[in-house]
Swiss-Prot record:
Expressed by the venom gland. GO terms for molecular function: sodium channel inhibitor activity; toxin activity. It comes from the Eukaryota. Gene3D superfamilies: Knottin, scorpion toxin-like. The keyword Signal applies. This is Toxin Tpa7. Has the structural arrangement of an alpha-helix connected to antiparallel beta-sheets by disulfide bonds (CS-alpha/beta). Disulfide bonds join C32-C82, C36-C58, C44-C63, C48-C65. Its main location: secreted. GO terms for cellular component: extracellular region.
Length: 82
């Protein structure tokens, strides 16, 4: 039992240490967020994966992605004005 608790604790620590970028994928055509509607989670997931993220979902009105690589371009409020 103690071993199981130790294993779970180690896995949680690794997840905290190895965090990846997350945010809104950048639409390269207009520099805005990639838009979506409710219920289009699979579409956003595919769009996020095409933008080098691990997964994504529709956070209406835009897709939100997790697990971007460090060199991925994501939407930034300070730089992008859409």
């Amino acid at each position: 039992m103690k071993g199981m608790i130790l294993l779970i604790s180690c896995l949680m620590l690794i997840e905290v240490v190895v965090e990846c970028k997350e945010g809104y994928p950048l639409d390269t055509l207009n520099g805005c967020k990639v838009g979506c509607f409710f219920g289009t989670n699979s579409w956003c997931n595919d769009k996020c994966k095409s933008k080098t993220a691990a997964k994504g979902y529709c956070a209406w009105p835009s897709c939100y992605c997790y697990g971007f690589t460090d060199d991925s371009k994501i939407w930034d409020l300070k730089k992008n004005k859409c």
